[in-house]
Swiss-Prot record:
Chain positions found as Phosphothreonine: 1394
Biased composition (Polar residues): 318-334, 1042-1059, 1373-1397, 1445-1470, 1607-1618
Region of interest (Disordered), ranges: 231-266, 305-336, 653-699, 886-914, 1042-1062, 1323-1397, 1442-1501, 1540-1618
GO cellular component terms attached to this protein's record: BRCA1-A complex; BRCA1-BARD1 complex; chromosome; cytoplasm; nucleus
Organism this protein belongs to: Macaca mulatta (Rhesus macaque)
A Pfam family reported for this protein in Swiss-Prot or TrEMBL: BRCT
SUPFAM superfamilies the record matches: BRCT domain, RING/U-box
Protein name: Breast cancer type 1 susceptibility protein homolog
Sites bearing Phosphoserine, chain numbering: 114, 394, 397, 422, 433, 550, 693, 707, 724, 752, 839, 987, 1008, 1143, 1189, 1191, 1211, 1217-1218, 1280, 1328, 1336, 1342, 1387, 1423, 1457, 1524, 1542
Subcellular location field: Nucleus; Chromosome; Cytoplasm
GO biological process, one term: sex-chromosome dosage compensation
Length: 1863
């Protein structure tokens, strides 16, 4: 359900985005009769005419202020068609999903015309007016009541509601709050309100059949409403007058649906028991409107002025109608359940009223409430429902009304009973009687209302904060919640099926649980519906409110429940939560409503409004999520879960969390309120939250430290993050909280993570604009709450849980993050202007258009969406920064020490942010994002990854490091961050963000968030990691990912600065300075601050990292990978070498950074014990795929970043200067070494070199971090070895093994190599610089560029490698993966300048030549000649790529494309980095390549150093590569040794030691997962997989590793390190190579023993195969070759497959053609199973059991085409002619190239094979027979013969030949 819900949510987001785009800026509704102005802005004709008619003369365009006239307006049929199509899509979406589209108000408008809708709407529509509605409400003129009365009276009479007028009169005072809902102005508000209205409409619809019942309800509801109004009068009195008309309508609704009223009262809906309708709209409207009462009036006036009111009203009406339609569809159930709901609501209201104001205005309610009567009442209600169906169907009769009256009393009794558990069964019966329809109605209503609210909030930036009278609330909440919770638990228990039905029915709408609850509790149902609507509204309107209030309410509820019915309620609630927190939704909604009501009661109107706005935004996202994931019910559940997840937990969670939430939120609010327009809402939110906190200070303080922090931190934080959004999310979150409490957090959190992801995405989006409210509520709340609260609450496990949630969420959060990022970006685009409104607007817009932004981003590559999506915007980086901070804090949270420090820092940051509010507005957003993202690191990580990730990190680190740093960094750095860093961030962010965005688009933002998470986490975490061994391991992983993040994400800016930082703190700072002010700021933030952070966070990180490792080892890979950059920087700052090492290690897990989406896969894989490499690989694939599509973007950004980075690198050349200056020396040295390495390396050289360029860079850093890099190199060497072995499969084998290895490397090296590529290039630079390794040459050449291009390449390589992985996977799937890779690369290259392209092309040509030479050399040379050859080709490509860094990405693209085609994966990953690296200088390029090779084999590097020097000068990669081949083997050996040594070296090197210790001996960067998993076998496996990547990288790794040892020493003295490292490099390489020959040989033997090729597999499946191959040291190639032993086919359960080229070639070659199940089963059984049981038995064309593969394998000597001469003539599709000829040759035929070449009379039978459908000439092939005396057959003869492995008769396949004369 989550997946479908997620998909639905994505679709809904896209539709929402489209809707948003097609909205009229004036009325904020879908454009009707669109007209375009001469300024090309589109508006509704009506809106424009109204605008133009307002004054004489020309008016101004609302958007651009240009003069417009009626004459200038032109009809825009295109837009009208778009709108029509969108409406159709929405309609289809609603039909398909059963969800009421949140923004379907346009349909609702159309639907409004339906009589039922008109009837229903009348009561609600009378509510009236469009823009005048607000005025009416403000004026509370009778005109509206009269309107309502007239319209209502008509529809009410139609509906059978005769008492409409009377009800209106009675309820008018109470109705005001209801009408406030009408006053939502934004389309989103309208959507939300429409939802509310729709609730009301549904209620009206329900009322329609229950006119009399409504009257009855009205009577009781009126009484309740009176009570309620009295209670709420303080809040609603001023609104009552304004809402009189509305009140009338709503009163009907309220009377009809006391439950709604109850929800309303609960949510401070005034005393509108009749507010079923009123309550639905009133609750939600009141929540938003009451909350917004004053604000609503003002806003309504404003909105009216903005002419948004009409749109709002319309949209509200539309939504109402939509809701009504929904209700009408399920009108009978609606009315029934509404009566019951009314009863329930009335009862609860009465209960509440009794508790709150024992006002006896509802004596009947009180009388009706008797629990004793409930059972009979429920029965009556059931009967009435059955009758109400008739009533509804027959007429809106007064019988229904009177029955309704009786029923209402019964319902009230039922409600009482239900609350007392007495009527639960009957309630369930009611529910059962109408489970689906009521649920749907409610779900839709809730959905629409929440959407409405969200839209409103988003558009108008309302932040509804509930300063709920928590005491009152607690009482009311106690009773209501107790009753509701009890009822809910009962209901939940009794209607789990109903809930399921509801969910099934409305899978997408998140209201199912609530709907069920509502249905189950007729009253409860309505109440949940209304409450859920209210909750949705509250959560939408005041997610913060809901959060705070919910928290408070939950606290209150928990407290009161504890006090009153706590044990039972809690138990029941826990049961409920066990049941699925179905009762919880009601509880939550009731709590939310009560909270709202309390908030309303307490002067929370404005704050509630603000909170509601933010909440609405949240809800919108949540709604999307809810809609998709049944979020509303779930959300309610979640809230209830929070509250009721186990009531104890709920109490604790909400009480503690709310407490923490309030405090943290307050901190966040303070911080966030500093952010621009957010401030306006934030203060309210803050106030509300503070009030909440103040109201429940005891609860907060008391509960926070309690177990709730454990649960609440993740759950509540997430709840807070997405109160409304989190409704469903909360459900899951709370479930996850429960899970978290139960140590199930990861899974549940992952589930909730998706929603949280999306909800938080929207929440974060909202929170970004409304950072305090939303971010605070969503992510900020999580982060700050977790950080601050954790600090306050001392809940480190909570932090862990929170991190768990955050990391579990990453997949989902990724979506949210990206969306958030975009939202933030958009919000930041106009951060201060209408920040709240815009932010909220953009929040919803982005939430709605999450997919849309992805589309648009891909579509409009460099358009504004890209910028906001990519966080190119300055605001975005800040957001990212905040996100990063949040993640960092999250990580800190994970580590108790880190958490407290982080929390303190965060709090300091919050305080300082508050102090620096203006400057920190955006920064705060970023900071808060960071904070928020602690709990959902992925989400924020995404943001942080997006652009501000590094900066976020640094800012957070600043915050984390010290309060002082926080203000300085937030104020100063964040400003630079905002401004100067933003630009670097822009380029770097664009590079990273682009890639990330693209990746995120592809990966659902999985990569970036996690990356960012890792990044942020790692900054503190990695920093401390450096200090501690445990942290080292984590730092290895984290640093790896962080390095990748920083190197990959902020590769250009921060990455280079990290690289610069790598050499030393001074270097970091100097490099930062050189990199640029912004970069310096970023680096200083990251690096300088990180040193502090490092120092401060080290212990913290230490604790944290272990925790993180334990909790999210995979995510550590992800997180660590993500976090490595910060770690790197902090490490570098703290321990330059350690930093570099960490960086290098980090760069080993760039996949996480590279592919968070793949990390998702990885997460799933991780579950399979493939966590790290799998995660990396998953990421790699997705990232690769992402890279492909985003590559242009990424490349552009990368190119930009690259250029900038190059400049930065050059500018930061002070540090790099030694590097660069020494690089030539190192190049020479290294090239001498490399010359030895290349021959070996060249095989992997492409990959290795490419990787090496990254690896070299990284290894340069790594050399500084020699131990880490040694580990990495060892792993890489092993990988390289294995890769070599993998590549033993000859060209394709080697190539593909390279690719495979690369893929594996990407998997392993995604952890290792991708980060290696990313971080490696940076590190390599640093290492080159500090180590003076031959790698430096490459880095010299590409150091500046590697910084720029290297960073770019890192990013690209991340993408490239990932895409290569994905491509290899898809290459296996489709042979076009190469072209995909190529296209991706070429698209990336398109971004490069023409000059660069030309250079790259030239270099490409040279590299190709060298590759050819290298291939020849490698074939001749090297222990794996055949493998070497492919490796060489691959390496050559990689080397070419390495060489061509300056050449252009285009050349690289070409090169990569070529390589891709040849070795799709192999070359791209490294080709990119290599290209970029080598782009720096051609000679350098050559050298770089060689150094990359050299890196591959350190010992070879030594020997090659001189040789390479010569080669370098000669530019003969060949020569260099020949030794490289040897060296490669040596390197593998060396690497193996180094792996062994690296551990000791790590131990030797404190900074390096930690990483290596962490990873164990294996190279942590690439071997993190590898060596962590299997130091010996997995490292080899990892390396084998890495080999392709490590093919070069292993050399790099090896090369780096030896130096790294010395670099470890050298790292202490960078200058010395160069020479020492070089020497050590050589010595170590030699020693390793001495030791490693065996390893190499064994690996080669393993690879020779088995070589896999996959066909038809998805990237995920390919990743699994890759893991499998890596585990068993099997070569995994992309192309089949003679060395291939197994072809893994995608088959069905009967081992029947599709026919693919590899299938045919595998059969023709007598290879094992086995099913993919062989791999899966072997993995399951943890042993390699016999292939016999999994051999493919048949195919879909030739038969399902023809046993062709077995026949071919068992008869290798029996060639089916023996004695045949076959000429493959003419064009062929789907298969190259040479492949067809090879296939024929493998089957024993002799191939003839030309028809004239047939050797007639030699005993050979000539046959001509053609493919007629491939011929463009119709009859060209018919005359072939005349050209030669040979039968002409179709290609099918060959294919069928090969598939069956039986030579088929020619007769069937003969092509009739036309006489030559006819031809």
């Amino acid at each position: 359900m989550d997946l479908s819900a997620v998909r639905v949510e994505e679709v809904q987001n896209v539709i929402n985005a489209m809707q948003k785009i097609l909205e009229c800026p004036i009325c904020l509704e879908l454009i009707k009769e669109p007209v375009s102005t001469k300024c090309d802005h589109i508006f509704c004709r009506f809106c424009m005419l109204k605008l133009l008619n307002q004054k004489k003369g020309p008016s101004q365009c609302p958007l651009c202020k240009n003069d417009i006239t009626k004459r200038s307006l032109q009809e825009s049929t295109r837009f009208s068609q778009l709108v029509e199509e969108l409406l159709k899509i929405i309609h289809a979406f609603q039909l398909d999903t059963g969800l009421q589209f949140a923004n379907s108000y346009n349909f609702a408008k159309k639907e409004n015309h339906s009589p039922e809708h008109l009837k229903d709407e009348v009561s609600i529509i009378q509510s009236m007016g469009y823009r005048n509605r607000a005025k009416r409400l403000l004026q509370s003129e009778p005109e509206n009541p009269s309107l309502q009365e007239t319209s209502l009276s008509v529809p009410l009479s139609n509906l059978g509601i005769v008492r409409t007028l009377r009800t209106k009169q009675q309820i008018q005072p109470q109705k005001k709050s209801v009408y406030i809902e009408l006053g939502s102005d934004s389309s989103e508000d309208t959507v939300n309100k429409a939802t509310y209205c729709s609730v009301g409409d549904q209620e009206l619809l329900q009322i329609t059949p229950q006119g009399t019942r409504d009257e009855t309800s009205l009577d009781s509801a009126k009484k309740a409403a009176c009570e309620f109004s009295e209670k709420d009068i303080t809040n609603t009195e001023h609104h009552q007058s304004s809402n009189n008309d509305l009140n009338t309508t709503e009163k009907h609704a309220t009377e009809r649906h006391p439950e709604k009223y109850q929800g309303s009262s609960v949510s401070n809906l005034h005393v509108e028991p009749c507010g079923t309708n009123t309550h639905a709209s009133s609750l939600q409207h009141e929540n938003s409107l009451l909350l917004t009462k004053d604000r609503m009036n003002v806003e309504k006036a404003e909105f009216c002025n903005k002419s948004k009111q009409p749109g709002l009203a319309r949209s509200q009406h539309n939504r109402w109608t939509g809701s009504k339609e929904t209700c009408n569809d399920r009108q009978t159930p609606s009315t029934e359940k509404k009566v019951d709901l009314n009863a329930n609501a009335l009862y609860e209201r009465k209960e509440w009223n009794k508790q709150k104001l024992p006002c006896s205005e509802n004596p009947r309610d009180a009388e009706d409430v008797p629990w004793i009567t409930l059972n009979s009442s429920i029965q009556k209600v059931n009967e009435w429902f059955s009758r109400s169906d008739e009533l509804l169907s027959s007429d809106d009769s007064h019988d229904g009304g009177s029955e309704s009256n009786a029923k209402v009393a019964d319902v009230l009794d039922v409600l009482n009973e239900v609350d007392e558990y007495s009527g639960s069964s009957e309630k369930i019966d009611l529910l059962a009687s109408d489970p689906h329809e009521p649920l749907i109605c409610k779900s839709e209503r809730v959905h629409s209302s929440s959407v409405e609210s969200n839209i409103k909030d988003k558009i108008f930036g309302k932040t509804y904060r509930r300063k709920a009278n928590l005491p009152n609330l607690s009482h009311v909440t106690e009773n209501l919640i107790i009753g509701a919770l009890v009822t809910e638990s009962q209901i939940m228990q009794e209607r789990p099926l109903t809930n399921k039905l509801k969910r099934k029915r409305r899978t997408t709408s998140g209201l199912h649980p609530e709907d069920f609850i509502k249905k189950a509790d007729l009253a409860v149902q309505k109440t949940p519906e209304i409450i859920n609507q209210g909750t949705n509204q509250m959560e939408q309107n005041g997610q913060v409110m809901n959060i705070t209030n919910s928290a408070h309410e939950n606290k209150t509820k928990g407290d009161s429940i504890q006090n009153e019915k706590n044990p039972n309620a809690i138990e029941s609630l826990e049961e409920e939560s066990a049941f699925k927190t179905k009762a919880e939704p009601i509880s939550s909604s009731i709590n939310n409503m009560e909270l709202e009501l309390n908030i309303h009661n307490s002067k929370a109107p404005k704050k509630n409004r603000l909170r509601r706005k933010s909440s609405t935004r949240h809800i919108h996202a949540l709604e999307l999520v809810v809609s998709r994931n049944l979020s509303p019910p779930n959300c309610t559940e979640l809230q209830i879960d929070s509250c009721s997840s186990s009531e104890e937990i709920k109490k604790k969670n909400y009480n503690q969390m709310p407490v923490r939430h309030s405090r943290n939120l307050q901190l966040m609010e303070d911080k966030e309120s500093a952010t621009g327009a957010k401030k306006s809402n934030k203060p309210n939110e803050q106030t509300s939250k503070r009030h909440a906190s103040d109201t429940f200070p005891e609860l907060k303080l008391t509960k926070v430290p309690g177990s709730f922090t454990n649960c609440s931190n993740t759950s509540e934080l997430k709840e807070f993050v997405n109160p409304s959004l989190s409704r469903e999310e909360k459900e899951e979150k709370l479930e996850t909280v429960k899970v978290s409490n139960n140590a199930k957090d990861p899974k549940d959190l992952m589930l909730s993570g998706e929603r949280v992801l999306q909800t938080e995405r929207s929440v974060e989006s909202s929170s970004i604009s409304l950072v305090p409210d939303t971010d605070y509520g969503t992510q900020e709340s999580i982060s700050l709450l977790e950080v601050s609260t954790l600090g306050k609450a001392k809940t480190e496990r909570n932090k862990c849980m929170s991190q768990c949630a955050a990391f579990e969420n990453p997949k989902e959060l990724i979506h949210g993050c990206s969306e958030d990022t975009r939202n933030d970006t958009e919000g930041f685009k106009y951060p201060l202007g209408s920040e709240v409104n815009h932010s909220q607007e953009t929040s919803i817009e982005i939430e709605e258009s999450e997919l849309d932004t992805q589309y648009l981003q891909n579509t409009f590559k460099v358009s504004k969406r890209q910028s906001f999506a990519l966080f190119s915007n300055p605001g975005n980086p800040e957001e990212e920064c905040a996100t990063f901070s949040a993640h960092s804090r999250s990580l800190k949270k994970q580590s108790p020490k880190v958490t407290s420090e982080c929390e303190q820092k965060e709090e300091n940051q919050g305080k300082k942010e508050s102090n620096i509010k203006p400057v920190q507005t955006v920064n705060i957003t970023a900071g808060f994002s960071v904070v928020c993202q602690k709990d959902k690191p992925v989400d924020n990580a995404k943001c942080s990854i997006k652009g501000g990730s590094r900066f976020c990190l640094s800012s957070q680190f600043r915050g984390n490091e010290t309060g002082l740093i926080t203000p300085n960094k937030h104020g100063l750095l964040q400003n630079p961050y905002h401004i100067p860093p933003l630009f670097p961030v822009k380029s770097f962010v664009k590079t990273k963000c682009n890639k990330n965005l693209l990746e995120e688009n592809s990966e659902e933002h999985s990569v970036s968030p996690e990356r960012a998470v890792g990044n942020e986490n790692i900054i503190p975490s990695t920093v401390s990691t450096i200090s501690h061994n445990n942290i080292r391991e984590n730092a290895f992983k984290e640093a790896s990912s962080s390095n990748i993040n920083e190197v990959g994400s902020s590769t250009n800016e921060v990455g280079s600065s990290i690289n610069e930082v790598g050499p030393s703190d001074e270097n970091i700072q100097a490099e930062l300075g050189r990199n640029r002010g912004p970069k310096l700021n970023a680096v200083l933030r990251l690096g300088l601050l990180q040193p502090e952070v490092c120092k401060q966070s080290l212990p913290i990180s230490n604790c944290k990292h272990p925790e993180i490792k334990k909790q999210e080892h995979e995510e550590l890979v992800q997180t660590v990978n993500t976090d490595f950059s910060p770690c790197l920087i902090s490490d570098n700052l703290e321990q330059p070498m350690g930093s570099s090492h960490a960086s290098e290690v980090c760069s080993e897990t760039p996949d996480d950074l590279l592919d968070d989406g793949e990390i998702k896969e990885d997460t799933s894989f991780a579950a399979n014990d493939i966590k790290e490499s799998s995660a990396v690989f998953s990421k790699s694939i997705q990232r690769g795929e992402l890279s492909r599509s985003p590559s242009p973007f990424t490349h552009t950004h990368l190119a930009q970043g690259y250029q900038k980075e190059a400049k930065k690198l050059e500018s930061s050349e002070e540090n790099l200067s030694s590097e660069d200056e020494e690089l030539p020396c190192f190049q020479h040295l290294l090239f001498g070494k490399v010359s030895n390495i290349p021959s070996q390396t060249t095989r992997h050289s492409t990959v290795a070199t490419e990787c090496l360029s990254k690896n070299t860079e990284e290894n340069l850093l790594s050399l500084k971090n020699s131990l880490t890099d040694c580990s990495n190199q060892v792993i890489l060497a092993k990988a390289s070895q294995e890769h070599h072995l993998s590549e033993e499969t000859k060209c394709s084998g080697s190539l593909f093994s390279s690719q495979c290895s690369e893929l594996e490397d990407l998997t392993a090296n995604t952890n290792t190599q991708d980060p290696f590529l990313i971080g490696s290039s940076k590190r390599m630079r640093h290492q080159s610089e500090s180590q003076g390794v031959g790698l430096s040459d490459k880095e010299l050449v590409s150091d500046d560029e590697e910084r720029g291009t290297g960073l770019e390449e890192d990013n690209q390589e991340e993408q490239s490698v990932d895409s290569n992985l994905g491509e290899a996977a898809s290459g296996y799937e489709s042979e076009t993966s190469v072209s995909e890779d190529c296209s991706r690369l070429s698209s990336q290259s398109e971004i490069l300048t023409t000059q660069q392209r030309d250079t790259m092309q030239d270099n490409l040509i040279k590299l190709q030549q060298e590759m050819a030479e290298l291939e020849a050399v490698l074939e001749q040379h090297g222990s794996q000649p055949s493998n070497s050859y492919p490796s060489i080709i691959t390496d050559s490509s990689a080397l070419e790529d390495l060489r061509n860094p300056e050449q252009s990405t285009s050349e690289k693209a070409v090169l990569t494309s070529q390589k891709s085609s040849e070795y799709p994966i192999n070359q791209n990953p490294e080709g990119l980095s290599a290209d970029k690296f080598e782009v720096s200088a051609d000679s350098s390029t050559s050298k770089n390549k060689e150094p990359g090779v050299e890196r591959s084999s350190p010992s070879k590097c030594q020997s090659l150093e001189d040789r390479w020097y010569v080669h370098s000068s000669s530019g003969s990669l060949q020569n260099g590569n020949y030794p490289s081949q040897e060296e490669l083997i040596k390197v593998v050996d060396v690497e193996t040794q180094q792996l062994e040594k690296s551990g000791p070296h790590d131990l030797m090197e404190p900074s390096y030691l930690p990483r290596q210790d962490l990873d164990g001996t294996p190279y942590l960067e690439s071997g993190i997962s590898l060596f962590s998993d299997d130091p010996e076998s997995d490292p080899s496996e990892d390396r084998a997989p890495e080999s392709a990547h490590v093919g070069s990288i292993p050399s790099s790794t090896s090369a780096l590793k030896v130096p790294q040892w010395q670099v470890a020493e050298s790292a202490q003295s960078p200058a010395a390190a160069h020479n020492t490292n070089t020497a050590g490099y050589n010595a170590m390489e030699e020693s390793v190579s001495r030791e490693n020959p065996k390893l190499t040989a064994s690996t080669e033997r393993v690879n020779k023993r088995m070589s896999l090729v996959v066909s038809g597999l998805t990237p995920e499946e390919f990743m699994l195969v890759y893991k499998f191959a890596r585990r068993y040291h099997i070569a995994l190639t992309n192309l089949i070759s003679e060395e291939t032993t197994h072809v893994v086919m995608k088959t069905d359960a009967e081992f029947v497959c599709e026919r693919t080229l590899k299938y045919f070639l595998g059969i023709a070659g007598g290879k094992w053609v086995v099913s993919y199940f062989w791999v899966t089963q072997s993995i399951k059984e943890r042993k390699m199973l016999n292939e016999h049981d999994f051999e493919v038995r048949g195919d879909v064309v030739n038969g399902r059991n023809h046993q062709g593969p077995k026949r071919a394998r068992e008869s290798p000597d029996r060639k089916i085409f023996r004695g045949l001469e076959i000429c493959c003539y003419g064009p062929f599709t789907n298969m190259p002619t040479d492949q067809l000829e090879w296939m024929v040759q493998l089957c024993g035929a002799s191939v003839v190239k030309e028809l004239s070449s047939f050797t007639l009379g030699t005993g050979f039978h000539p046959i001509v094979v053609v493919q007629p459908d491939a011929w463009t000439e119709d009859n060209g092939f018919h005359a072939i027979g005349q050209m030669c005396e040979a039968p002409v057959v179709t290609r099918e003869w060959v294919l069928d013969s090969v598939a069956l492995y039986q030579c088929q008769e020619l007769d069937t396949y003969l092509i009739p030949q036309i006489p030559h004369s006819h031809y």
